Amino acid sequence: MNKATEMLSRWQRQRLDTVHANRTDYGHGPDSVTVLAYYWGADVEKPDTFFYRIESAFRETWLHCGMMKSVIVTDRPTKELLSFAQKFPCVEIQIEPSLIPGNLYTMSADCDGKFADRFSTDYLMVIQDDGFPLRSGLEEFLGKWDFIGPPYVRDKFFPRLIARMFNLWTANGGFSIRSKRMCDMAQKYWREIYHAYPDCHAVGEDAYYTETLLRRHREYRRTMKMADCRSAIRFAYDCVVEQPVKSLPFGFHRAETFVFFANRGWIQI
């Protein structure tokens, strides 16, 4: 665990012990959104060592957005996971045996080919233990786009011009919102073509939804509305691609991004 992850983890533990202690009601969130996270690859002998991190991600999401239908996709049920779902009836555990610990391709394959079957609402908000909302404002990002996530298009004139011309707004999927119709179409292409692909960039979950399908399939490119960079930066930031972030976005992805916000005083730690 690096220093950035340690800082985020300490903050998550502190919040669970204070803000979220004994709390079971976060109010009602939008009925049009399902929240989903993966919980897999944990240590076989101590599977719940880091469960507090995914619990924190869900609780922070509910705190800022209200309680919504919530799905946890896992390779196996664990004691803490089952206890969490029992405490919060809005949480559904979905067992996926194809998830292999340490193999990111198996998660990407599930995102690419099975997302559409994992929810029935208009939108899916994907969160991770290092990617979730930090403030209220979810409604601003619903009903306008089929995908919004931390932008990976660089803050330069020509990259953004090309993105605007061809609707190629490459983005991170670890913390994102995507529409049901996008997931339906992505699943269709997966079953027809991409299920046969080996582990490669084209089928990595981020690239598949925001790059591969946009470049290779006219129907997808013409149908799907991707959030532009300016809107995406208000939604979330991932510091792997530098962007002109001037205030706290709705959420974040990556522990290093969390530290970036903390160093600017946007998060109290």
PLM region spans:
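Short beta-strand/turn micro-motifs composed of small residues
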Residues: 37-41, 72-76, 149
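Catalytic core and acceptor-binding pocket of nucleotide-sugar-dependent glycosyltransferases
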Residues: 168-269
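Short, acidic, metal-binding catalytic loop of nucleotide-sugar glycosyltransferases
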Residues: 56-68
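N-proximal low-complexity "stem/linker" segments adjacent to membrane-targeting elements
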Residues: 1-56
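Short, flexible/disordered intra-domain loops and linkers
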Residues: 43-52, 102-106, 165, 192-202
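Conserved donor-nucleotide/metal-binding helix-loop-beta segment in metal-dependent transferases, i.e.
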Residues: 132-165
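Active-site-proximal specificity loops/subdomain of glycosyltransferases
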Residues: 73-122
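Short beta-strand-to-loop acidic/aromatic patch adjacent to the donor-nucleotide binding site
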Residues: 120-133
